[in-house]
Amino acid sequence: MVLMIVSGRSGSGKSVALRALEDMGFYCVDNLPVVLLPDLAHSLAERNMSAAVSIDVRNMPESPEVFENALTSLPDSFSPQLLFLDADRNTLIRRYSDTRRLHPLSSKNLSLESAIDEENVLLEPLRSRADLIIDTSEMSVHELAEMLRTRLLGKRERELTMVFESFGFKHGIPIDADYVFDVRFLPNPHWDPKLRPMTGLDRPVAAFLDRHTEVHNFIYQTRSYLELWLPMLETNNRSYLTVAIGCTGGKHRSVYIAEQLADYFRSRGKNVQSRHRTLEKRRS
């Protein structure tokens, strides 16, 4: 069974995540004090039910030791996982402006911007311990719920999930990436007028890139690097490894290479997911 601890800055989507987890069969509790986590887990162990609990600045423990003690007191049948949601500063400000809700730290006579910044500092101990960090800045409510369903229901218990994610540098680097590889130096299909409207998922673009030795060398050396360190990453008690591949616009080279790497590790029996940030943004 899983004890999913959901944390993140206010406005990043914790309520949406809890609703999605509840739809997946989790017993969900909003803002449960950390010291009560073992009691909740023991009561649900008898019912063989996974749980999801949100933690934010309102119920943060006074010290990291309190959090660690609570986790070590869980029944052996429970596997704790920490999901941290985040969004960039401007997105959080816009969301608060749209909903006109008060920030949890507004009672300290802070401006909204200062409250968001202070919350970021207070939550850093949880963020640094997270098994999975999701940046919701460019996600709709539906997209966040769908991502959680895909990642959680598509994951075999206690197995590392490799996520290969393409992106465009002009749109920013994904903050949830464990590794970032820059492929802007590779031949660019964008300069071929016939290939420009296509993506790295289309065969003509794939054929163009496949003709270049440097593309093959990059894929080979990148997968060799990942294969070298993957055994240690798998034994490091982590749930996800997110590998981000970036080109200029996130449309051709990064998409193709992310798919090639995903296919390779999938063929080796690894649990693999792929995501293309720019293409998904264009479809939304």
UniProtKB/Swiss-Prot annotation:
Reading the lineage from the top rank, the first entry is: Bacteria
Q: What pairs make up the disulfide bonds?
A: none
Chain positions recorded as ATP binding sites: G8, R9, S10, G11, S12, G13, K14, S15
Alphabetically, the GO molecular function entries are: ATP binding; GTP binding; RNA binding
**Which keywords annotate this record?**
ATP-binding, GTP-binding, Nucleotide-binding, RNA-binding
SUBUNIT field: Homotrimer.
Q: What is this protein called?
A: RNase adapter protein RapZ
